[in-house]
A protein has these predicted regions:
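Structural motif of enzymes handling amino- and sulfur-group chemistry
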Residues: 1-65, 71, 75, 81
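Gly/Ser/Thr-rich helix-start
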Residues: 10, 93, 130
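PLP-dependent enzyme catalytic core of the Aspartate aminotransferase-like
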Residues: 73, 80, 98-145
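Conserved hydrophobic/aromatic beta-strand scaffold that supports enzyme active sites
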Residues: 5, 64-66, 97, 125-127
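Short amphipathic alpha-helical segments with coiled-coil-like heptad repeat character
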Residues: 26-32, 86-87, 134-135
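Mobile, glycine-enriched helix-loop/loop "lid" segments at the mouths of ligand-binding/catalytic clefts
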Residues: 88-102
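A generic structural signal for well-ordered coil/turn residues at beta-strand boundaries
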Residues: 61-63, 92-94, 120-122
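A common structural junction motif
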Residues: 82-92, 143-145
Length: 145
């Protein structure tokens, strides 16, 4: 049974990855326009310094990216109040996930190491799943009110 389920998952992986890539890029573009965001780091965006390299190396751009909120308080408020975005879970699921890397995945890094790799306490890592983008946008906006 497990092998059968894995086979089914693999057979639709390309379609799911393309859908996730498209949604992630749209969400990142929307985030770039928001006044509560300082910077969005997504390799599919024209603003990314290594966009050409990413397009050359990857057939599908992953749905995981980072955004720096204008303040730590705003980033934390979003994480605490979001209803749709799941927190502290592994990325790559069908559901959208978020984390503050300086507190979770990179918590063992020093402030200097975090700064060197472009992560601040207001950086939020997003993994966009298959939810409706309108719902995700509304969830974020409602969470930071």
């Amino acid at each position: 049974l497990d092998v059968h389920l894995i086979s089914l998952g693999i057979s639709s992986l390309k379609v799911r990855m393309k859908a996730s890539e498209k949604a992630s890029k749209k969400f990142a573009k929307w985030l770039e326009k928001q006044d509560f965001i300082k910077k969005v780091t997504h390799p599919a965006l024209k603003s990314h310094p290594q966009r050409a390299l990413a397009k050359k190396q990857m057939k599908i751009i992953p749905s995981v990216f980072c955004a720096d909120f204008k303040s730590v308080e705003l980033a934390e408020k979003f994480i605490e109040n979001a209803k749709i975005f799941g927190e502290k879970c592994s990325f790559g699921s069908a559901d959208s996930r978020v984390e503050i890397p300086s507190k979770i995945s990179h918590a063992s890094f020093s402030k200097e190491e975090l700064k060197a790799i472009g992560i601040s306490d207001s950086t939020v890592r997003f993994s966009i799943g298959f939810e409706d983008l309108k719902d995700l946008k509304e969830d974020l906006l409602e969470a930071i009110k």
